[in-house]
Amino acid sequence: MRSGFPYPFLTTEAVAPVLAEHANDEIRETVVKGVQRGEVVIAIGYSEPDAGTDLASLKTRAERDGDHWIINGQKMWTSLANYADYVWLAARTDQNAEKPHRGLTMFLVPTDFEGFSHTPVRTMGVRTNATFYSDIRLPDKYRVGEVNGGWKLITGQLNHERLSLVTHGQVAALYEAVCQWAADTPAAGGKLLEQPWVQANLARVKTGLEVVKLICWKQAWSMDQDALGMAEASMAKVYGTEFFVELYRLLLEVMGQAGTIVSDSPGAILQGKLEFRYRVGSVLTFGGGANEVQRDIIAMAGLWMPRTR
């Protein structure tokens, strides 16, 4: 990501590892290897109009019909659905489960199947989508994991996603570009980089980046040891995403009004990358689960505090 090339990190870092572990051999051979070759993009279908943070209350249904599943429902905030080859979809397969999360199953839905459609949802930052599933007839081979065993896959995938949101390479490259810009920009008879307040801002950014890097390395090691916990992933997500928002603010202070010019406007500095990152940065604090909920997870799974008083 440091290089700046397009990189579908939700596909490669968040969904593909779960498919590699839990999908059947055909999916591993076609989809997972397609991801490795850079040929496959996967969107995530979790949130619904009435189910966001409370994901276990989702209503999209999958009903078995022989060797197929009939899927009906709607998802919201399905980023990349307009590009994706598949949607990693959570659907309810048991309407009478004792606990709602025990009636969910995971599917991989090809976006070229009849019955799938999407419409754009424009935000302040990037485009996302509403996706619709109308009597999609899906072969059972696209089911991932056990029937009604989807919750475990969802939580595992979300742990990966929360870490993927705080990879520091792209942000570190932006920091280095701003440092170089400040070193080249005249100010008060010298260079902007020589100003004490600029140095203070950049020092705060550099320190935070080093912390995020160490967190990422620690969690990467945990994944290698198959020991990544919910609390650890949530800690990384909360610290990293909130620091990134602060980082963009500090760098914008250094660049001033030049940093607020959008990429396709005359006078844009650094191709408008800082303006764009600052504008979309807040989505990281609720993508993959709102940070308020992550703090609850840290309290329960990391500090062993009770769910209720």
Where in this protein do the model-derived segments appear?
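Internal helix-loop-helix
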Residues: 1-29, 33-38, 80-86, 209, ...
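A short core secondary-structure module
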Residues: 68, 72-119
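A structural signal for short hydrophobic beta-strand segments in well-ordered beta-sheet cores
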Residues: 60-63
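Short Ser/Thr-interspersed hydrophobic loop/turn segments at strand-loop and sheet-helix junctions
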Residues: 1, 90-92, 108-113, 134-138, ...
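A short, Trp-centered hydrophobic/proline-enriched beta-strand micro-motif
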Residues: 38-46, 90
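Glycine-rich beta->alpha junctions and the first turn(s) of the following alpha-helix
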Residues: 116-211, 284, 300
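C-terminal helix-coil-helix/basic helical segment that borders enzyme active sites and/or dimer interfaces
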Residues: 183, 187-191, 210-266
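Glycine-rich phosphate/cofactor-binding loops in nucleotide/flavin-utilizing enzymes
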Residues: 14, 151-160, 164-168, 255-309
